[in-house]
Amino acid sequence: MTSDDDNELMGRARKGDLDGIGILFERYHGSLVGFFRRVDGRGKIGEDLAQETFWRIVRYRKSFDGRRPFRAWMFQIARNVMNDHLRKSMRAGKVMDPRVELNEELAAQPDSDVSAEVERGERKELLREALSRLPLEKRELIVLCRFEELPYAEIAPMFGCSVGALKVRLFRALKELKEVFIQLGGEKTA
């Protein structure tokens, strides 16, 4: 799977052949759900937001510019979907608690070494909690760079900066994440 293939599929979609979008959906659905889960902290909403992202891809397919990789365009739309979702959630007064889903995931794992799973779950929960305490832009940056592994050159335009400035922002975001993670770990053990 190359960005040329993705761009070709989107080029066909721009002309009305929507079969390509189905292929792109299958190819990137998991990545989008993961992106939303990591940024928002709730897996169930990730599925809905991934579908909304692809709905917008279909709706705005004519605005796709083949000079930019499809994946970067898709994640820019995903960022917009996430921002819209967070605005609606804040207006509705909904509170997000990622710990509920983590406990459901642990309960669904049969025949596992319970103590190892609990320890892994605690570290995972600390990381999720630390990530959730960062500002949205820093969470998105970490998820796109470290979890989705998009190239810096594709991410920089999403944040309106150069690759060098993006690296500085990522360094600072990771440093802040580490500080929050250590802080949370200290609170948990003290």
Model regions: which residues?
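Sigma70-family region 2
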Residues: 14-15, 38-41, 52-69, 88-90
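Short, charged helix-capping/linker segments at alpha-helix termini
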Residues: 2, 14-23, 33-52, 163, ...
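Structural recognition of an alpha-helix C-terminal capping motif at a helix-to-coil junction
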Residues: 48-55, 68-80
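Short amphipathic alpha-helical boundary/capping segments
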Residues: 8-12, 126-134
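DNA-recognition helix of helix-turn-helix
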Residues: 79, 83, 87, 126, ...
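Internal acidic/polar
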Residues: 2-3, 92-120
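Arg/Lys-rich amphipathic alpha helix in sigma70-family domain 2
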Residues: 59-66, 76-97, 120
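Amphipathic, Lys/Arg- and hydrophobic-enriched alpha-helical face
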Residues: 25-43, 60, 131, 176, ...
